[in-house]
Amino acid sequence: MQIVVATHNEGKLVEIRRILEEDLGVDAENIELVSAGSLHLPDPVETGVTFQENALLKARAVAIRTGLPAVADDSGLIVDVMGNAPGILSARWAGAHGHDKANNALLLAQIGDIPDDKRTARFRCAAALVVPDTEAGADVTGGVAADGITVHTTAADGSTAPVHARYAIKSETVELGDMPGRIIREARGEHGFGYDPLFVPDDQPAGRVSTEPDHEGEPLTSAEMTSAEKNAISHRGKALKALVPAIEALLH
């Protein structure tokens, strides 16, 4: 069975594949994960006001177009003293999307006078699975058949015009996962991305502490953890783990 991951980021596809197929025991032989980017599907505009809404929006867009089950996630950082900001704006908190250094610098400036015991935060992820109703068939613009993956372009008059299928939705599932922790005052670590260098998770790997100069023996940031250590406690891993029963149900 093919499942489309609603992303154009191949790194995220690899991470989700690893979590689902290895860490969580989903049968790799029966599931082929493909990215929306590899199918040349456009990114939908994220108009939701919650992580759940945006995850569902992205998964729906893919399932409707392809006729295949779709998985999507939306995640970000919630800082308690900032009224749960940056939230859904985490990736573009400083203006430009994905500018990690600028986002981190702005966050540190905004909570610079907050004492350490009040710098609590959490990463939150919403993971969604949307299953299309393929038995009902698809509405097809242009009046010719479409298989959901191949976009047919043969029009009745012999010209070429893009044709897109639109499948109805059969079911939707969305799950949440949190990784609680706190924001430190300067970046540490070379792994991860986003706010990872500023975030110290509450759950720490046994026997491992920071070796950074002036911070020896302190708890690790997300960016100091290995991928396996981070996946074991991550918000995305927790949300996807909660989604596994719904994915496994598709195989039976």
UniProtKB/Swiss-Prot annotation:
Function as written in the Swiss-Prot or TrEMBL entry: Pyrophosphatase that catalyzes the hydrolysis of nucleoside triphosphates to their monophosphate derivatives, with a high preference for the non-canonical purine nucleotides XTP (xanthosine triphosphate), dITP (deoxyinosine triphosphate) and ITP. Seems to function as a house-cleaning enzyme that removes non-canonical purine nucleotides from the nucleotide pool, thus preventing their incorporation into DNA/RNA and avoiding chromosomal lesions.
Residues engaged in binding Mg(2+): D74
CDD domains found in the cross-reference section: HAM1
Documented EC number(s): 3.6.1.66
Short name of any one Pfam family annotated for the protein: Ham1p_like
GO MF entry, a single one: ITP diphosphatase activity
Record keyword Thylakoid present: no
List of residues binding substrate: T7, H8, N9, E10, G11, K12, S75, F193, G194, Y195, D196, K230, H235, R236
Record keywords, A-Z: Hydrolase, Magnesium, Metal-binding, Nucleotide metabolism, Nucleotide-binding
Cofactor binding note: Binds 1 Mg(2+) ion per subunit.
UniProt-annotated stretches for the region Disordered: 201-224
Top-rank EC class of the record's enzyme: hydrolase
Catalytic activity: XTP + H2O = XMP + diphosphate + H(+); dITP + H2O = dIMP + diphosphate + H(+); ITP + H2O = IMP + diphosphate + H(+)
Cofactor: Mg(2+)
A GO term from the CC aspect: cytosol
Location of the active site: D74
Disulfide bonds: none
Organism encoding this protein: Bifidobacterium longum subsp. infantis (strain ATCC 15697 / DSM 20088 / JCM 1222 / NCTC 11817 / S12)
Subunit relationships: Homodimer.
GO-annotated biological processes: nucleotide metabolic process; purine nucleoside triphosphate catabolic process
Family: Belongs to the HAM1 NTPase family.
Protein name as catalogued: dITP/XTP pyrophosphatase
